Every structure is written in structure tokens, then in C-alpha cells.
A protein has these predicted regions:
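Short, gly/Ser/Thr-rich active-site loops of penicillin-recognizing serine hydrolases
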Residues: 163-164, 168, 256-269
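Short, charged, low-complexity patches
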Residues: 134, 249-258
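Beta-lactam-recognizing serine transpeptidase/beta-lactamase-like catalytic domain environment
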Residues: 1-5, 11-245
Length: 269
């Protein structure tokens, strides 16, 4: 499991839609690059740019730390934790009914200070997410809120080479409402149209979010994420790319995703 960086803003967005509702679209937040949460300089939340006044959709596309830290604080630790739990991000993912992934970690709890809540809401701090759980969430957003089980194993064999019977899991799990899934699909599509560039991902009809998790103060040590799916009935594929020591999500993990997805669409994989 890895620090999710700004991919966690997908989770904070879902929680905002669940707890604040549609009013979140009509509001604006002021980003002056630095947010003084509590008067303690070390707790200041820093943004990647001075965005000025931004709405919800623009804040996600520009990955505004100030906006999403303030949204997380407004939602509160308990409700944000409930969203994380309901999306399955602290649970292991079972593959082919037999293999369990690592579990995620989410430590935010009632009574935690605003600074901790704010940093958590933008995917920094102690939160850890397993790529398999993030992939399951991407599948759910693309699939009307329903997550499908993962089956990647054709068969199991014992030491004698005999096939062991196992039952494939086919049960879908409703992780979020179809309405919120649809809204998240639109928001993630807007990320690509307005920020990453449809021209860079031509023909993919991509819905995505990048993330750059800062492990220390060295960019080369960052964990780079690029997550999402193709909104395409002929190529209904979700993806998660995680690059350890990857510098930047959009610059490192994004091109990796593009190469694989284009190979799928072009039939050259």
C-alpha cells in the first residue's frame, strides 16, 4: 500500500457529494497558495499554485490542495472516515476468490485537529491505499457505483499438477450510489479535457486523476499515481498506475497508462 497523494481527492470529492450534496457545485474557495489552518506555520497547507477563486470542478481538475483541505475539514474526520470505509479502501481485495491484497490504512478519527484532517483530505499524512482497492473504486465509478470482483487466475494446481477446484466470485458490490458515480465520471472526464489534455490521450475518452505523494523533500522519491478508466463501451477498462520514485503522477505515471491503453485500443498489446 502507498500514500495516495492527490488521487485521494477522488475520495474527498465523493465524501463531499455524500455529505454536502449538490450545493458543493455552486460554491467557491479562495486559494492563495498557503492556507494557515491553525496559526502554526508547520501545519500550513501549501498548494501547487495560487489558483484564486475556484469552484469544485475546477479545484479537482487543478488539484487544489487549499480547496480540498477545507472541504475535508468541513466534512469532518468521522464522515470522511465513513466514506473511506464504505469505498473499501481499508479492506483487502480478493482476487480470483483466493488471493488477498494488502489492506489500506486510514487513521483519521473524531477529535483530530483540523490540520490533520486537511492534510488527510489531500492524500498526504499517514493514509495508505492499496492499488487493488483503488482499481476497484475506479471500476465502481465507471460501472454505476458497482464494483465487480477481480478474476485473473485461470486455474490453481497442486504440486502434482492436478487442478484444484475453486469458486470464482461473481457478486457485484455497490460501493457508491449510481448518481454520485455518474457525477464523479463527469468530474474525472473534465480533468482530462481541461487539465491533462485530450490531445495527449487521443481516442481514449479518458476519465482520470493524477497524484504525486511526497515521501520526503526530494521529488525523485515521490510516489507517482495515475488512475481512472476509459468511458468506452467497446473498451471498458479501468487502470491504476503507481510508479515508485516516480517524480510526478501526470508526467511519469500518465504516459505509462497511455501506452498500455493505446495498445489495447489499437489491438497491439
Amino acid at each position: 500500500s502507498y500514500t495516495p497523494g492527490s488521487t485521494f481527492k477522488i475520495v474527498t470529492s465523493i465524501s463531499a457529494l455524500q455529505n454536502i450534496g449538490s450545493d458543493v457545485y455552486s460554491r467557491k474557495w479562495q486559494c492563495d497558495k498557503v492556507y494557515d489552518v491553525d496559526g502554526i506555520e508547520e501545519d500550513n497547507i501549501i498548494c501547487n499554485a495560487r489558483h484564486g477563486k475556484v469552484d469544485f470542478e475546477t479545484a479537482l481538475a487543478k488539484s487544489c490542495n487549499i480547496t480540498f483541505s477545507q472541504i475535508a475539514i468541513e466534512i469532518g474526520p468521522e464522515k470522511l472516515a465513513n466514506t473511506v470505509e464504505s469505498l473499501g479502501l481499508t479492506s483487502s481485495v480478493t482476487v480470483s476468490g483466493q488471493i488477498n491484497s494488502a489492506k489500506g490504512k486510514f487513521y483519521l478519527k473524531a477529535g483530530d485537529p483540523d490540520a490533520t484532517t486537511g492534510w488527510t483530505g489531500i492524500g498526504q499524512g499517514q493514509t495508505l491505499v492499496c492499488p487493488a482497492a483503488m482499481l476497484r473504486l475506479m471500476c465502481a465509478i465507471a460501472n454505476d457505483g458497482k464494483a465487480v470482483p477481480f478474476n485473473v487466475v485461470d486455474r490453481f494446481e497442486n504440486q502434482a499438477g492436478k487442478t484444484i477446484k475453486f469458486t470464482r466470485d461473481t457478486k457485484e458490490t455497490q460501493l457508491l450510489s449510481s448518481d454520485i458515480a455518474s457525477q464523479m465520471k463527469d468530474l474525472m472526464r473534465n480533468n482530462v479535457k481541461t487539465q491533462y489534455g485530450d490531445n495527449k490521450y487521443k481516442g481514449l475518452n479518458l476519465c482520470a486523476k493524477s497524484g504525486t505523494a511526497q515521501i520526503d523533500n526530494v521529488d525523485a522519491h515521490n510516489t507517482a499515481w495515475f488512475v481512472g478508466f476509459m468511458d468506452d463501451d467497446e473498451n471498458p477498462y479501468a487502470f491504476v498506475v503507481v510508479a515508485e520514485k516516480g517524480n510526478s503522477g501526470s508526467q511519469t505515471a500518465g504516459p505509462m497508462a497511455k501506452k498500455v491503453l493505446q495498445a489495447i485500443v489499437n489491438g497491439t498489446y
